[in-house]
């Protein structure tokens, strides 16, 4: 790939950013996931992070990125409502992959939030958005700021939902580079990688879960359901982490 003056890209106008990102992404689409990660580490600054929900297929991204950058900070935004199996999975992968794990939480405890606001996840789309702002978006923003992150990795894939179908490999979100090396991978690609490196799926996959989140907004898949309908009562797919100006909404990982 040609060299790009990416240090200056964040200072350019929105139109200039769009044009240059389109050129870069055309090149990145031709690379393998491993090559994309290496390119990002060589071109997107010096301070990186990997955001992980430790969901169904999270072992792939964690293994892929830490193979190239073993000490990269792994950011988990812990709502306090994850499944017990998710917390056990976090412990398992942290030990096995020697993860440099950083756990960020809302500044107000879950019990205090319920006392103040009630069960926000039962209050329609607006309640879910507020819940996500408090428990996902603000902690992630704080993590990126405190770790001085120049670019962060995420395991989003186009195949996962309609809201992700047109996402590029490289984007700028809220003034920080966001990099999606698995964006064009299929479920079969994921399975092959897990098998190749003897990596586990999340344990609840075997019980019918396709996507993992909080206990109160995650459902098992049933015949006729899309993957999107297993999260947030089908009202939303995203949790907030993957939207521009996400603090004003609250939508995904």
UniProtKB/Swiss-Prot annotation:
Biological pathway: Sulfur metabolism; hydrogen sulfide biosynthesis; sulfite from sulfate: step 3/3
Q: Where is the active site?
A: 239 (nucleophile)
Task: Look up keyword Signal and say if it applies.
Answer: no
Give the keywords, sorted: Cytoplasm, Oxidoreductase
GO biological process per UniProt: hydrogen sulfide biosynthetic process; sulfate assimilation, phosphoadenylyl sulfate reduction by phosphoadenylyl-sulfate reductase (thioredoxin)
GO (cellular component) term, any one: cytoplasm
Localization per record: Cytoplasm
- Which InterPro entries does the annotation name? PAPS/APS_Rdtase, PAPS_reduct_dom, PAPS_reductase_CysH, Rossmann-like_a/b/a_fold
Quote the EC number.
1.8.4.8
Report the family membership.
Belongs to the PAPS reductase family. CysH subfamily.
Stated name of the protein: Phosphoadenosine 5'-phosphosulfate reductase
Designated gene of the protein: cysH
């Amino acid at each position: 790939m040609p060299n790009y003056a990416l240090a200056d890209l964040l200072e350019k106008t929105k139109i200039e950013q769009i044009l240059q990102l389109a050129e870069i992404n055309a090149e990145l689409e031709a690379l393998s996931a491993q090559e994309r990660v290496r390119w990002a580490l060589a071109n997107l600054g010096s301070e990186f992070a990997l955001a992980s929900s430790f969901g169904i297929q999270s072992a792939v991204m964690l293994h892929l990125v830490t193979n190239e950058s073993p000490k990269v900070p792994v950011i988990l935004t812990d709502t306090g409502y994850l499944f017990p199996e998710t917390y056990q999975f976090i412990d398992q992968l942290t030990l096995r992959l020697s993860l440099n794990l950083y756990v960020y939480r809302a500044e107000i405890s879950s019990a205090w939030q319920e006392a103040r606001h009630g069960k926000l996840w039962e209050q329609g789309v607006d309640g879910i958005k507020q819940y996500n702002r408090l428990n996902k978006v603000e902690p992630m923003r704080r993590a990126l700021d405190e770790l001085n992150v120049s670019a962060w990795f995420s395991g989003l894939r186009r195949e996962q939902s309609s809201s992700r179908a047109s996402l590029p490999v490289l984007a700028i979100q809220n003034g920080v580079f966001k990099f999606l090396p698995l964006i064009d991978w299929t479920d079969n690609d994921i399975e092959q990688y897990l098998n190749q490196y003897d990596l586990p799926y999340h344990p609840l996959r075997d019980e019918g879960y396709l996507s993992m989140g909080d206990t109160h907004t995650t459902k098992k898949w049933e015949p006729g359901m899309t993957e999107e309908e297993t999260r947030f009562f089908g009202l939303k797919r995203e949790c907030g982490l993957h939207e521009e100006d996400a603090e004003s909404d609250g939508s995904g990982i």
